[in-house]
């Protein structure tokens, strides 16, 4: 079975949101606003993804009360702390901008692919994608991702490895893939953990 992802979107500054065709929305803001040349306007919306349809209603209620300013402040603090840990590493590579830029891009990717525990995934781990057959944690990737996370997020690195050890077999092997529904866990290409 393929997991279905439900996207919950809430436009906080909108009065009305309508679908247009299969892939577009028309958003009518609560207040008319004449945008002057050279000026900008900010429209706030929240988007969250859930893997079970019944969770979508809970997510909608939760995102209605998000304190945006505090969320952005907390996120900036987390990002800056992680960035500082990585860029201040005692490495000759962190002295050259080309390598520093790559490190920042790697940090962005590691953060973007992180997923919290859900369903039969008991510890947070990274998904290469959240849709299709790759919507889960892959053992080969997990060990490498953990080795990157440990520089700025040691608890995330630990969680990445524990997600696979949750399914470790008696012979020491871990599944090649674990998913939201454990029926999809792939034992056919199992591997010894390289943690």
Show the residue positions of the predicted features.
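Substrate-binding groove/exosite segments of carbohydrate-active enzymes
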Residues: 84-195
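Acidic/polar, glycine-enriched structural segments that form the non-catalytic walls/loops
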Residues: 1-135
């Amino acid at each position: 079975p393929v997991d279905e992802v439900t996207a919950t979107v809430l436009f906080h500054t909108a009065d009305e949101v309508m679908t247009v065709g299969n892939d577009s929305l028309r958003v009518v803001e609560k207040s008319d606003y004449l945008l002057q040349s050279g000026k900008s306007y900010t429209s706030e919306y929240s988007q969250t993804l859930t893997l079970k349809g019944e969770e979508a209603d809970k997510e909608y209620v939760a995102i209605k009360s998000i304190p945006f300013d505090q969320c952005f402040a907390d996120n900036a603090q987390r990002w800056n702390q992680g960035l500082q840990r990585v860029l201040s590493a005692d490495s000759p590579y962190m002295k050259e901008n080309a390598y520093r830029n790559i490190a920042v891009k790697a940090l962005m990717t590691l953060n973007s692919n992180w997923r919290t525990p859900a369903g039969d995934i008991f510890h947070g781990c990274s998904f290469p994608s959240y849709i299709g057959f790759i919507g889960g944690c892959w053992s080969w990737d997990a060990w490498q991702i953990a080795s990157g996370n440990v520089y700025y997020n040691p608890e995330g690195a630990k969680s990445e490895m524990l997600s696979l050890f949750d399914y470790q077999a008696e012979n020491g092997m871990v599944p090649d893939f674990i998913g939201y529904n454990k029926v999809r866990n792939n034992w056919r290409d199992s591997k010894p953990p390289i943690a």
